[in-house]
Amino acid sequence: MPARFMAETFTPAVLDAQRRYYGRSAQRGPSGEPDHLGPEEIEFLSRRDSFAMATVSPDGWPYVQHRGGPPGFLQVLDAQTLAFADFKGNRQLISTGNLAAGARVALLVIDHAHRDRLKVLGRARVLDAREHLELADRLAPTPALRKKVERLLLIDVVAFDWNCPSWITPRYTATEFEEMVSPLRRRLEELESEVARGS
């Protein structure tokens, strides 16, 4: 676990809980500089088609929202900045309102097929897509997507941590499923052809 992630999440209450339930606590470590995303994180994030994003209301209530789009809609602008287009939705704007009051976000990004999980802490900025057309074009690269963009979110990465695969149920997208079964279909067709020729 990276030191910065531990510094941000291993609060005194967390360390007390570790001591209570496990008899000892981890070392919190110095906060230091924000983490930088490496090639593994960048490649992983760039392939995702969804993630969960948590914000906190001014009253202290956490709020978790699913964000989705085509694979690659969550883009890595540089080693410390993530961005994505905020498409038209249910018009509640709870995350947007929470971010106006406090910039902290937490992302939970999961690849169910490979049972990989990356947690990201950051500070987010909400931009009006109409005022940042070039970035909007980059984050929503097709005309159909551009029509649905209302806001852009930029996240300055503070810390991240790869989490263990425990309890991640393997699930597959239709594309991933097709990639797995297409060789079996081809082989089945070959065998059926052989049987047909032999009859």
Regions found by a protein language model. Give the residues of each.
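Binding-site signature for planar aromatic cofactors or substrates
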Residues: 1-199
